[in-house]
């Protein structure tokens, strides 16, 4: 089990760090009191491997919390629990700028002087920083760059290319565009099997309908160009930190053309090693509602 304790200066990026760890599959808990760390660790280890990666954000500004944290860390070491400390740091100038931009009050500056609060917190956290296994200074890092730094330290690099989960979703425009779509493609320009008497009753999952849709030159040109575009977009989406991508493909009713095209795109992505799911949202919608045009 990998057990990471995340701490550091206020405004240095702890919230973004925990989000990045969550994207990497860590079970994350924010602001757990240090006294509860031993019991939490024991509970996680007793899951028999169901929880393999844990990250805790610990807020230890108060003096009593320091004693509690060091006692808890001592207990973990004595009991054989391995842990790592990730410390987030930043320069005074950058922290002041971030607090001013967010219009937040520093938690240790009751007099309103941000710099005084930062100085006090920096002194209190010095011993924790000295014990840290990894220190990330976020002064010059954008959100994406911090995420990349987290991935470099805590990511499973042999699996990183598969962390973007793709869903190819067919739908019918008459039933509404899926609200969670990232990309939407309209295939109503393709020849419609609905108007072919012997195909009307079938769906795009049936070979005879799929063969009909894919038999046209315009269909193959569209699929090829869409695949080329996805080959360009997917690695760039991942580079920017995206972990889920929903590609929605729509026709009129969501039963014939969109289903056939979605299946073609799904198979193409799958053959390239992507982690991809397929869903035909409206394939039976018109049958259930007694609709006509598909």
From Swiss-Prot:
ATP binds at residues 8-15. It comes from Clostridium botulinum (strain Langeland / NCTC 10281 / Type F). Belongs to the RapZ-like family. Keywords: ATP-binding, GTP-binding, Nucleotide-binding. This is Nucleotide-binding protein CLI_3561. GO terms for molecular function: ATP binding; GTP binding. Displays ATPase and GTPase activities. It comes from the Bacteria. GTP binds at residues 59-62.
């Amino acid at each position: 089990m990998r057990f990471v304790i995340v701490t550091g200066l206020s405004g240095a990026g702890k919230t973004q760090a925990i989000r990045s760890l969550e994207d990497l599959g860590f079970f994350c808990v924010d602001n757990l009191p240090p006294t509860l760390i031993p019991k939490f660790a024991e509970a996680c280890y007793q899951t028999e491997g169901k929880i393999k990666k844990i990250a805790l954000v610990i807020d230890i500004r108060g003096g009593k919390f320091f004693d509690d944290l060091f006692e808890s860390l001592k207990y973990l070491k004595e009991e054989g629990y391995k842990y790592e400390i990730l410390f987030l740091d930043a320069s005074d100038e950058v922290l002041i700028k971030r607090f001013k931009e967010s219009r937040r009050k520093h938690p240790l500056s009751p007099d309103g002087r941000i710099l005084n609060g930062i100085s006090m917190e920096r002194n209190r956290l010095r011993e924790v920083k000295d014990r840290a296994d990894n220190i990330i200074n976020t002064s010059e890092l954008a959100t994406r760059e911090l995420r990349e730094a987290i991935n470099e330290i805590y990511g499973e690099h042999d699996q990183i290319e598969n962390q973007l989960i793709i869903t190819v979703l067919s739908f019918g425009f008459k039933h509404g565009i899926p609200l969670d779509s990232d990309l939407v493609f309209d295939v109503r320009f393709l020849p419609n099997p609905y108007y072919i008497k012997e195909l009307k009753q079938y769906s795009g999952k049936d070979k005879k309908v799929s063969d009909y849709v894919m038999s046209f030159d315009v269909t193959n040109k569209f699929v090829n160009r869409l695949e080329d575009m996805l080959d360009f977009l997917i690695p760039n989406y991942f580079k920017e930190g995206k972990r889920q991508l929903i590609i929605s493909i729509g026709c009129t009713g969501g039963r014939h053309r969109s289903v056939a095209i979605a299946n073609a795109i799904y198979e193409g992505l799958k053959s390239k090693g992507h982690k991809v799911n397929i869903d035909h949202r409206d394939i039976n919608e018109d049958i259930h509602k007694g609709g006509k045009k598909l």
